């Protein structure tokens, strides 16, 4: 699409004035996604060439946004959020692995943008995290394979700039793990608390998905991973938030309570270095 190409050139050369491009950015990318969308009931029939160009344009815009403009112009944040909302369909449901990777290439750009860590962080995270958790869940790839891939994530050089057309589920899982790792690794205490709360909401079945507490191994594994991958200085937030959820959530099922207690046991048994963990308060 010619208009998409022109927008990419503008974004590539734009050093400032992103606020003036926000409306055009939103309108062009949302229109391009509507053109690329499946015409029938089959969600795997996206025009992924157009979608890839949308994801590239999205990443260009959000990564080049000056932090000073982000703090003073809500319109930019709104435009970024609206386009991301439209892109969500590329990463959820019965789509192809290539479609998931295209979606993640856009999200990767967002996570390296100053807009991601503003006060809009809860909105952005609640949008992208359920899809990422779907991809690393046992419904996509068996837990033993995902757990093995997670052991190599910090050294994984996988790039989302060139999306392969024949990607297998394990490749997509690697990409999702890397995104989760990057987000956790750069989270401060406030953002980490929001991350834990959103993960619990996913496990509770509050994200238009069924509850995941029945899966003993995966629910424990994903919560323990939050501790393992978060910065040592703020990872104390994870067990404290879990205990708070355990004691303050009304009408919680016995299964949920059991899983949270099991998770605490796993965290403490592993003797992970947790700076600032007050065992008296925790108990």
Predicted regions and their residues:
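Structural marker for long, regular alpha helices in very large eukaryotic proteins
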Residues: 1-9, 13-283
């Amino acid at each position: 699409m010619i208009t998409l190409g022109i927008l990419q050139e503008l974004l590539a050369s734009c050093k400032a004035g992103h606020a003036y491009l926000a409306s055009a950015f939103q309108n062009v990318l949302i229109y391009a996604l509507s053109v690329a969308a499946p015409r029938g009931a089959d969600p795997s029939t996206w025009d992924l060439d157009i979608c890839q160009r949308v994801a590239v344009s999205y990443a260009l815009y959000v990564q080049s946004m000056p932090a000073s403009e982000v703090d003073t112009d809500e319109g930019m944040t709104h435009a970024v959020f609206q386009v991301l909302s439209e892109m969500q369909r590329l990463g959820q449901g019965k789509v192809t692995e290539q479609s998931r990777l295209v979606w993640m290439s856009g999200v990767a750009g967002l996570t390296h943008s100053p807009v991601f860590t503003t006060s809009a962080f809860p909105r952005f995270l609640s949008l992208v995290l359920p899809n990422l958790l779907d991809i690393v869940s046992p419904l996509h790839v068996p837990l033993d394979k995902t757990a093995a891939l997670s052991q190599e994530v910090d050294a994984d050089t996988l790039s989302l700039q060139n999306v392969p057309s024949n990607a297998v589920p394990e490749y997509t899982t690697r990409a999702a793990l890397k995104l989760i790792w990057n987000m956790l690794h750069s989270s401060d205490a406030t953002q980490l608390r929001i991350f834990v709360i959103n993960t619990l909401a996913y496990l509770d079945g509050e994200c238009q998905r069924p509850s995941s507490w029945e899966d003993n191994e995966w629910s424990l594994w994903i919560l323990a991973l939050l501790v393992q991958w978060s910065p040592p200085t703020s990872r104390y937030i994870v067990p404290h938030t879990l205990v708070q959820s355990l004691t303050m959530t009304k009408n919680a099922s016995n299964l949920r309570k059991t899983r949270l207690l099991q998770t605490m046991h796993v965290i403490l048994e592993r003797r992970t270095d947790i700076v600032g963990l007050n065992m008296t308060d925790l108990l």
